[in-house]
Curated annotation (Swiss-Prot):
Keyword line: Acyltransferase, Lipid A biosynthesis, Lipid biosynthesis, Lipid metabolism, Repeat, Transferase
UniProt GO molecular function: N-acyltransferase activity
Role, per record: Catalyzes the N-acylation of UDP-3-O-acylglucosamine using 3-hydroxyacyl-ACP as the acyl donor. Is involved in the biosynthesis of lipid A, a phosphorylated glycolipid that anchors the lipopolysaccharide to the outer membrane of the cell.
Identification of the protein by name: UDP-3-O-acylglucosamine N-acyltransferase
Source organism: Geobacter sp. (strain M21)
Lineage: Bacteria, Pseudomonadati, Thermodesulfobacteriota, Desulfuromonadia, Geobacterales
Length: 345
């Protein structure tokens, strides 16, 4: 598929600079672009590459330096490029129906245009919406409810009675609804607390590969609308994550913690249990959150503190060995002076 630069600009709501009739047949990065491709500039640190890229045109922020290249100006070039990927990329065709080798138990309700690949298994009483795709190895336990336009990639498991909303994508190897980590000490060992709740994944959520979201002990672990979860994330039982949150890889969230809306947790953040994090909070990578966090803050560190304070503390840390030597020398000198004063010298 080829489109003129002007057609692409009209599709995006952008403005053409240069030859609007140049044909674009693909998309590429600044470094790898060639003739007939469109590239994009979203991060100013790469602005110098616009002068050297071999792309036929560049998508960039309004008023950017084109270095004489054909361009589309757009107020949000990153978002615009994402939309172009959808326009230029054609997803592989998928078969419709239950393919040989898939297992569908009695009492399952399948919506229209469902694709169930070989090796997928759907338990009794499950309800599957329209245009759902279940890739090989997907296992839906009895009583699972899946909304419309959902894609579950290979080897995703959704345990009994859990509920998946509309337009949800879950990537390979993720487990939804495994038992929460709950044990009661009995004096000699530990008694397993039955985890009889569920997990609810609301609409427009995307979950990466090899994540685990544990079922609640009694009610529901809930991931609210629009949240995006990276790979290798652990979410414990009874956690509630608000709308439009970003949870980056290797985050661990302990049981019964609640996140507000628009919360961002950087990679490897650890969050203690039974706490609340307010709306619009950003937590830097590798931080430890041990207590409640008020809304509208940017925090980092272990334990978390205002991000600017953490940067100052981190800058001091490499100097601590030398500072210790200096402090020891000062302490020794003060002790010598005090001894002289005591002798009346």
């Amino acid at each position: 598929m080829k489109k003129t630069l002007r057609e692409i600009a009209e599709y995006l709501g952008g403005t053409v600079s240069g030859d609007g009739e140049v044909l674009i047949g693909g998309l590429a990065t600044l470094d790898d672009a060639g003739e007939g491709t469109l590239t994009f500039l979203a991060n100013p640190k790469y602005a110098a590459k616009v002068a050297t890229t071999k792309a036929s045109a560049v998508l960039m922020g309004t008023g950017g330096n084109t270095h004489g290249k054909n361009a589309i100006f757009h107020p949000n070039p990153y978002l615009a490029f994402a939309k172009l990927l959808t326009l230029f990329y054609t997803a592989p065709a998928k078969p419709v129906g239950v393919l040989p080798g898939a297992f569908v138990a009695d009492g399952v309700k399948l919506g229209a245009d469902v694709s169930v690949y070989p090796g997928a298994s759907i338990g009794a009483g499950a309800v599957i919406g329209d245009r759902v795709v279940l890739h090989p190895g997907v296992v839906l336990y009895p009583g699972v409810v899946v909304g419309n336009d959902v894609t579950l990639h290979a080897n995703v498991s959704v345990r009994e009675r859990c509920r998946i909303g509309n337009r949800v994508t879950i990537h390979d190897g993720t487990v939804i609804g495994s038992d929460g980590f709950g044990y009661a000490p009995d004096g000699a060992s530990y008694y397993k607390i039955p985890q009889i709740g569920i997990v609810i994944i609301e609409d427009d959520v995307e979950i990466g590969s090899n994540c685990v979201i544990d079922r609640a002990a009694l009610e529901a672990t809930r991931i609210r609308r629009g949240t995006k979860i990276d790979n290798l994330v652990q979410i414990a039982h009874n956690v509630v994550i608000g709308e439009d949150c970003i949870i980056v890889s290797q985050v661990g969230i302990s049981g019964s913690t609640q996140l507000g809306n628009h919360v961002t947790l950087g990679g490897q953040v650890g969050v203690a249990g039974h706490i609340k994090i307010g709306d619009n909070v950003m937590i830097g990578a590798k931080s430890g959150v041990a207590g409640n966090v008020e809304p509208n803050q940017v925090l980092s560190g272990i334990p978390v503190m205002p991000h600017r304070d953490w940067l100052r503390s981190a800058g001091i840390a490499p100097k601590l060995p030398e500072m210790k030597k200096t402090l020891s020398a000062l302490e020794k000198r003060v002790a010598e002076l005090e001894a002289k004063l005591a002798k009346g010298e």
